[in-house]
């Protein structure tokens, strides 16, 4: 049995982490049997990174390597692709990593409002002590280093210039993928492939997170077909997950709970009215009982018993 260690669920997603989502989605598309173990207070990773896959004593890291491992085990979501579609898939994934991922990393890990109010609290609460004081800050620094290494070259010298450029590129990338998807359900044919897994993994946290700085998120939400794409994958492949409940499912639960509460209140009111009617009924008036006086120290004994409880 293959075991995948990944960051846990929230925001209606099976994982809040883009690369973990890529692996989870591809595994569902390919039908790979996985035991999913969220990072918790017993977390230990050989290289300190997630996602990582363990199978027969062999550890595999990084989404691309994990997906290749699945393919070697005959779990291949790309078997329907032609040679041209396969090469297009590689080009599109490279475009996502070059043009979209830096802005996603910046949104969650570098932007001060989102990092302090959303990202750091979430990851710190899901990381074992004392690593929870160190790991979120390290992940933030790693994200910034990754952005600067890939995009901080001349003529972009200052961080503000880099930020402006990566968000411009990300919006253009989102527009391109929106146009490429069009009205289709998936990017290639009627079944999802690795490209769908990467697009879903990178977009879903941006789409679903409760961000404070929503610049890129607002642009994504204006591209309704990409939002529907994420919603469809969640409902088609993750609806039965115990890890989380979709927004629509939560609304249904809340509505049923409200109806049940109203029904219970109605029944309680009815019972109270019946009880009042019974009290007012002549044949059910309680008989006046004579006052019983305690014998000896019984009263004091009873009081002591009550106090002892």
Swiss-Prot record:
Q: Organism's domain of life?
A: Eukaryota
- What CDD domains does this protein's entry cite? GST_C_Metaxin1_3, GST_N_Metaxin1_like
Indicate where this protein is primarily found.
mitochondrion
Location in the cell reads: Mitochondrion; Mitochondrion outer membrane
User: Per UniProt, which keywords does this protein have?
Assistant: Membrane, Mitochondrion, Mitochondrion outer membrane, Protein transport, Transport
Region annotation (Disordered) ranges: 274-309
Biased region (Polar residues) positions are 280-290, 300-309
- A GO-annotated cellular component: SAM complex
GO annotation terms (biological process): mitochondrion organization; protein transport
Write out the function statement from the record: Could function in transport of proteins into the mitochondrion.
| Family, similarity comment | Belongs to the metaxin family.
Indicate what this protein is called per its UniProt record: Metaxin-3
According to its UniProt entry, this protein's organism is Xenopus laevis
Query: Taxonomy-wise, where does this protein's organism fall, top ranks first?
Result: Eukaryota, Metazoa, Chordata, Craniata, Vertebrata
Q: Name the gene behind this protein.
A: mtx3
């Amino acid at each position: 049995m293959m075991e995948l260690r990944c960051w846990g669920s929230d925001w209606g997603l099976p994982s809040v982490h883009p690369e973990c989502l890529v692996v989870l989605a591809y595994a569902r598309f390919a039908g790979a049997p996985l035991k999913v173990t969220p990072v918790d207070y017993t977390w230990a990773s050989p290289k300190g990174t997630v996602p990582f896959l363990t199978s027969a004593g062999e550890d595999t890291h990084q989404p691309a390597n994990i997906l290749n491992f699945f393919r070697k085990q005959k779990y291949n979501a790309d078997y329907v692709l032609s040679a041209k579609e396969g090469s297009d898939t590689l080009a599109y994934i490279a475009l996502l990593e070059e043009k979209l991922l830096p802005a996603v990393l910046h949104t969650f890990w570098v932007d001060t409002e989102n990092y302090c109010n959303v990202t750091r609290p979430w990851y710190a609460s899901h990381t074992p002590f004392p690593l929870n004081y160190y790991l979120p800050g390290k992940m933030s620094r790693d994200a910034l280093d990754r952005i600067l290494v890939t995009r901080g070259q001349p003529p972009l010298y200052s961080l503000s210039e880099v930020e402006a450029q990566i968000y411009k590129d990300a919006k253009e990338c989102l527009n391109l993928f929106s146009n490429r998807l069009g009205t289709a359900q998936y990017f290639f044919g009627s079944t999802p492939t690795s490209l769908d897994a990467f697009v879903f993994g990178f977009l879903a946290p941006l789409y679903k997170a409760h961000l404070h700085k929503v610049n890129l998120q607002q642009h994504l939400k204006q591209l309704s077909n990409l939002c529907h794409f994420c919603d469809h994958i969640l409902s088609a492949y993750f609806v039965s997950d115990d890890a989380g409940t979709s927004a629509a499912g939560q609304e249904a639960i809340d509505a049923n709970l409200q109806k049940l509460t109203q029904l219970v209140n109605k029944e309680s009111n009815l019972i109270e009215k019946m009880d009042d009617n019974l009290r007012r009924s002549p044949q059910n008036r309680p008989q006046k009982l004579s006052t019983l006086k305690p014998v000896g120290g019984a009263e004091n004994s009873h009081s002591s018993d009550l106090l002892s409880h």
